Amino acid sequence: VLLDVGTGSGILAIVSLMYGIKEAVGTDLDPCAVEAVRENMEVNGVNADQFEMMIGNIISDPEIQDRVGYERYDIVVANILAEVLLPLTPVVKKCLKPGGIYITSGIIAEKEQLVVDAVKAAGMEVLEVTRQNEWVSVTARR
């Protein structure tokens, strides 16, 4: 099961479903994301019962955290600004199964170390840091 935090258009979860993930959950703050996800699932032939969408703040809302679930996910993806990843990372750790993978992206190069430090502070192991021009992705394991 994959969790896409800040799902937006749903593209990360949708592509994951197209490539073999069996079930995905997406969270976003913006209610407009629901329609964007629905349209993108339809365009890409993804079955609606494979993707559950939730609107709310997973960082600060215990109800959303409970709905998302704990130790449920094999993979969590988050293409969000570093400023959001910092408080998000300890929450993600609780969502991941032991050994689960956390993939972050959308990080500007100057913020790389902040995200790496947040991942380590949450008790996760940094597996890889990928850089492309001014953008960085950090991959970690719980």
Task: Please place each PLM-identified region on the residue numbering.
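Conserved SAM/SAH cofactor-binding pocket of Class I
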Residues: 1-58
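Conserved short alpha-helix immediately C-terminal to the canonical SAM/SAH-binding motif I
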Residues: 32-36, 84, 111
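A short acidic, Gly/Pro-enriched loop at the edge of an enzyme's catalytic core
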Residues: 63-75
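A short SAM/SAH-binding and catalytic strip from SAM-dependent methyltransferases
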Residues: 74-86
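Core SAM-dependent methyltransferase catalytic element
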Residues: 125-127, 131-142
